[in-house]
A protein has these predicted regions:
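Domain-scale detector for complete catalytic domains at protein termini or as standalone homologs
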Residues: 1-101, 105-260
Length: 260
């Protein structure tokens, strides 16, 4: 099925508003970029991306349940369930080409969403961008979600990318710890699996000092690409994209325009 031919029920449109923070394009919408955050992350982490692209690009950032705007929604602790729900919420927005960008856990989620769009709905994403995450067949999950609160929070702190106040303030910790544990349950139970290929360009990004994702492992995303594959290595660690924001966004922007 071609992009633009998809039709969905009104309830799916309502789900889109719940699942995505939507930064509307300043001109006519020619393409959409869906950003999928990391474990323990939220849409606000990618707020600067909302206005960083050309006028024809509408940016969507996933709002995972159990935090911020969705604090009262039940957390999701299964990759299958999370990917199913994100895919369904995206269906009303397939009238223009959609590119997927996922960071860390979000990279695995982006890959799963790309597969569901193709296999269940006959839609090929314009491209798949994956950041700071091993490909599916090279995963080595840590089961930190089975440990106590302090061990879990220490892992979050080690990786970075989460507001320190959420980790140290007792009241905030009580509010957000269930969502953090749910995310790390996804990470810890999503083990090695077949490198199911996608029918779109695959672009991979990693920091040269990432403690968990060596460059050689990131390059193995090429096994997922049936077509074009590019790997960009940037200075930094697991959250290189904070200090290298302008470089990364510029590269993603150029590829968005090239791919549709």
């Amino acid at each position: 099925m071609s992009v633009g031919a998809h039709r969905t029920a009104p309830s799916a449109a309502a789900d889109s508003g719940r699942w995505f923070r939507r930064y509307r394009a300043t001109g006519s919408v020619h393409r959409r970029l869906l950003v999928l955050p990391h474990a323990g992350g939220s849409a606000s982490f990618f707020h600067a991306w909302g206005t960083a692209f050309d006028p024809g690009t509408e940016v969507l950032v996933a709002r995972y349940p159990g935090r911020h705007d969705r604090l009262t929604d039940p957390c999701v602790d299964s990759m299958k369930e999370l990917a199913d729900q994100v895919t369904e919420a995206l269906l009303p927005l397939l009238d223009v080409p959609v590119t997927l960008f996922g960071h860390s856990m979000g990279a695995s989620l982006a890959h799963e969403v790309a597969l569901r769009l193709r296999d269940r709905h006959g839609v090929r994403p314009a491209a798949l961008h994956v950041s700071s995450r091993r490909p599916p067949h090279r995963l080595n999950p840590k089961r930190v979600h089975t440990e106590g609160d302090e061990a879990l929070l220490e892992e979050v702190r080690r990786l970075g990318g989460t507001d320190e106040a959420l980790l140290t303030d007792p009241d905030l910790r009580e509010i957000f710890l269930p969502a953090i544990r749910a995310d790390f349950t996804i990470v810890g139970t999503y083990g090695p699996r077949r490198a199911a290929p996608v029918d779109c360009p695959v672009y991979a990004y990693v920091g040269d000092q990432d403690p968990d994702v060596p460059v050689a492992e990131m390059s193995a995303w090429s096994d997922v690409a049936r077509g074009a594959f590019r790997l960009d290595v940037l200075p930094g660690g697991h959250f290189y994209l904070v200090d290298r924001h302008d470089v990364l966004v510029g590269t993603v922007s150029d590829r968005l325009l090239a791919d549709g």
